[in-house]
Amino acid sequence: MSNLLVELFVEELPPKALQNIGISFADQIYHSLVTQDLIEPPSELDAANPSPWKWFASPRRIAVWIRNVTQKAPDKQLAQKLMPASVGLDADGNATPALLKKLAALGADESAVSQLKREHDGKAEVLLLDRTVRGATLAEGLQKALDEAIAKLPIPKVMTYQLEDGWSNVNFVRPAHGLVALHGNEVVPIRALGLTAGNRTQGHRFEATQSPIVLRNADSYAEQLQQDGAVIPGFKERRDEIARQLEAAAGKLKLRPIEDEALLEEVTALVERPNVLVGQFEQAFLAVPQECLILTMKANQKYFPLLDAQGRLTNKFLIVSNISPADPSAVVGGNERVVRPRLADAKFFFEQDRKKTLESRIPGLSKVVYHNKLGSQGERIARVSEIANLVGTALGDQTLAAQASQAAQLAKADLVTDMVGEFPELQGIMGRYYAQHEGLSDDIAYAIEDHYRPRFSGDALPRNKVGMIVALADKLETLAGLFSIGEKPTGEKDPFALRRHAIGILRILTEGGLSLPLNTLLEQTLSVFQHEFDHDTALQAVEEFIFDRLSGSLRDQGYSVQEVDAVLAMKPQLLGDITKRLEAVRAFASLPEAASLAAANKRVGNILKKSDSAIEAAINPALLQEDAEKTLAQALAQVQPQAQQAFAAGDYTGSLKALAALKAPVDAFFDHVMVNAEDPALKTNRLALLATLHQAMNQVADLSRLAA
């Protein structure tokens, strides 16, 4: 066995897709060869060779190196099922035309009929043919693997280009100019994209010391490309080298590069051999908010801005160049000249935007369409402002309500600024800067920036209570409004990110300290919409959607399905209490009485559901005849007030633990008392007793959900 190398040499690949293309290319070829028995899958990974294959991807190549590939797959002995015997043989046992046709397709003739086996496959008697299937040669198997890999590449867009013959067209992500296929030091004769495989590749476009590079064997690929081609072909190795150079260059200046994994990945896909250089710009540009400058340098120029020890932007940045000239001044100077107009534009936008107040921009939002059924952004901020005022009022703080209403009115005003028009990623951030420039309070300024939070999993919540209220109002308005017009997520499609908005609402209510009932919030939110819709249907749909997200979130936090179902079955409206309820349920489940009480609770619930009698609100002591029902009534009279008092105080664990005293009387009741007594009065009274028991047991959670 020898190692295998396959490389496809192309024009510059799309940088954001490069990593996925490289991994897919290698993965498809490797697994296709495994399927064809041309590779033995390793039973154990060798510490010195931790993977049986390695992928390479640089701007102009994708490649795969595979260990221990055989020249030919072994032949296989197969007992191939042909067809039911009733179809293949006539009444006299002779072969039918259908059987002869099948045999001919497999390369056998009529003489093979006598050698057929008969077996029962569980449905009918079938005919089997013992045959030898020839194993594929490496050339055959690799051709198949390469064709499949190319067809399945995750290519964002394909282009059509003409081959050198002048009339053949090929569809691929970029024009391909070379194909390498080496098994050890032997070329594997395969073709793809109009190319014939060989052992020659190209190095760096400008800095290779040899062109072409004649590869000695499959194992020398990376080494020869680095030494003779000035290329680091491994994506990870190139990324690590860039990270090392960034840290080293920043360290010499006693600064640190901004951390951005996405930018690092993109730059890795843009260069073949990195060379990090230091550039700088005029100090005057630092008067512009650093978020603007950072975004300009990252998004447009792929530079790494440098920060000081306090995290403040400096006027220096790092350039990841694809060339290493003896005198880098021309490269650095060119990059500095290119970035200067970008920064000047940002400075101009910032200065122009500050000439108008945020409030003066609000009328402009009426020209920004939000949704054709829900109006403009101007109409939307009016609704969000009203919801924010209602939330602040519900919290009992009119000053807070007024601040939240004002912040909500201004929250979207930066959407019509020049800076946000150029860089939509800065919405909210620029609103905060402009609010501070106008002299508005930090509470309002930070609320404008933070009302988008949390934007993603793990994101921070708004920094102050005003921000919490505006963020909550914004997300409630989005969710309720879109549900009211039937724009619900379906399957994996969620174009308006409503799942993310629901998670944001949950996090603000559970972590943000806003103790407000969810149903009240939803009712108030829906009340601000003027269009016609079914209010009750929308309310129920939004509430169910939020509770579904809550259920998944709680399970992700480590609570069991039974614990979550038990608590959420009660539809608790104060979401901040849910964790306490879950901990109480967990503590209750550990009690020795828990299993019996949960089972009894389930039984009680079923009895009450099936009852065709009216259930009285109160128990009549005079109708308690059996000792067991009297004992249960007495126990309830003692336990229920204790459990209720603990529940009212928010001591959910204490409330559930108080129920433990009911185990013995509940067990005795079901052992000795017939609920469906012949006397209607006794039956009704016993149902009232069970209803009281059910109510006492199901305040914190539906304990029947814990029953096995």
UniProtKB/Swiss-Prot annotation:
* Subcellular location as annotated: Cytoplasm
Q: Which InterPro entries does UniProt cross-reference here?
A: DALR_anticod-bd, Gly-tRNA-synth_bsu, Gly-tRNA-synth_heterodimer
User: Coiled coil where?
Assistant: none
Tell me its EC number(s), please. Answer: 6.1.1.14
SMART domains with a match to the protein in the record: DALR_1
Q: What class of enzyme is it?
A: ligase
Its main subcellular localisation, reduced to a broad class, is cytoplasm
Listed A to Z, the keywords are:
Aminoacyl-tRNA synthetase, ATP-binding, Cytoplasm, Ligase, Nucleotide-binding, Protein biosynthesis
Q: Which HAMAP family match?
A: Gly_tRNA_synth_beta
Return the protein name.
Answer: Glycine--tRNA ligase beta subunit
